[in-house]
Amino acid sequence: MRAAGVFRTVSKNVATHSARKAVEGLLASSSDINGSVLDDTVVQKNCSLHIRGNLLGDLTIESGAKVVVEGSVDGKIVNKGGRLVVNNKAHAACVTTDGPAEAEACGVLKIDLTAIVSNWEKLAKYAAAAECAAVVKGNAYGCGIEPIAGALAKTGCRTFFVSDIPEAKRVRAVAPNATIYVLRGLYAGTGQAFAEINAQPVIYSFTEMAEWDLFVRSHRWAGGCALHVDTGESRLGFPLREAAAFAPSSRSYGITLLMSRLDNPEKPAHPLNDHQISLFCDLRRLYHGIPASLANSPGIFLAPKAHFDLVRAGAALYGVNPTPCADNPMFPVIELRGRIVRVLSLAPGETIADSVGWAAKRPTRLALVSVGYADGYPRSGRAFDDKLQAIVGDRRCLIVGHPSMDLLAIDVTDVSDPTAARPGNMVTLVGPEISIDDLAAASKSTGCEVLSHLGRRFHRIYYAI
């Protein structure tokens, strides 16, 4: 028998009255459940749960916790260092680390590889007949190319998009059979580097195409390339008329993918979406037989007609909301915690460095946390507006003033647990209560930007089951 509060249910939806009663019983006293559990459930640190039935909701297992399920497990499982036994078969967490040692680091960044794989599977299912490629550019949006590309390749992802040749080499090391496209295109004199790792450049101009064709022919190499066409973004790519004129002779250039990019897929009603899809359909007919790709993460949710032969899953893989006008359909991927290094007491009227006009209005306790803009925590666009927050103990607290290079200041005056705000303890900056999109909105940024800026001073933990 366990005391109240051992387990925490985080589901917003309870499917049936019986499920609600089962969860109430779980919260009240018992670590044993006779029957199936429909709710999403968190088993907290060093606690245990025995389910004599099926687990139909999602399950999070904290460090040191143990869960035994005698039936089937149909929900998503996030194992953060606990132990899971399903029908007498152990499912241990696979944990790898990177960066400085945890005791020496300013904070801890946990990256859930199981969630990334689940997000890819969800996007692939939504894309139906189209292949789902993974965009791992920018060091997998700051999350780490090798562990993420490796996990996705093992799951069945066959195609990856990277920023440059160094990133292509890193993907090739963990995905030896994958197709790899390099989005920054062909730099002069880099043909041999592409050939050595069997990667393909995304070609944006006749100049690049001519150099690539010369290299391929002179080296008698059958390497392919992607042709990128500008259908309305006005950034990179062949102008539409030039691409149409080039189509009759394109067969001899080894083009393996025709691609473009939607400019406003986050806004489903934007008229440019249908216009770009129509233009791309017309162009695809001229390049008959060559696979085509238009949709990025938001484009996958736009309409099936935007999917074509291949979709490019990027930010959504990492938990960023691809549908800003609706609830986030993706699983969260990261948890970021920072270390308290000092707790200050301020009298009314006192300020701190980088306070940008903030002053204590009452006797105030501030926790200084060793995370700052050098670690990628956002600073630009931030004014004192009560938007940036952190979780200290079980309470949501305001971050006051500007983040400095190495520090955040958090108002912990109202934290009731006297042990929560102590030097050495961790606070949550991104997690279940504060998503990456919440942090981005509060700092007038985007989820992609915040993720990509997360620095190398964190102790990184990659975990999966």
Describe each model-derived feature in a short phrase.
Residues G5-A103:
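Extended beta-solenoid/beta-helix repeat architectures
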Residues V6-R8, V14-H17, D98-Q200, D213-L214, ...:
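A charged N-terminal "starter" segment
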Residues S48-L49, K66, C106-V108, P322-P332:
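Short aromatic-glycine motifs in intrinsically disordered, low-complexity regions
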Residues I116, V171, L258, I340, ...:
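Residue-level signal for inorganic ion chemistry
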Residues F161, Y181, V202-I203, M259, ...:
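Conserved beta-strand positions in the central sheet of alpha/beta enzyme cores
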Residues S345-I465:
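C-terminal accessory subdomain/extension
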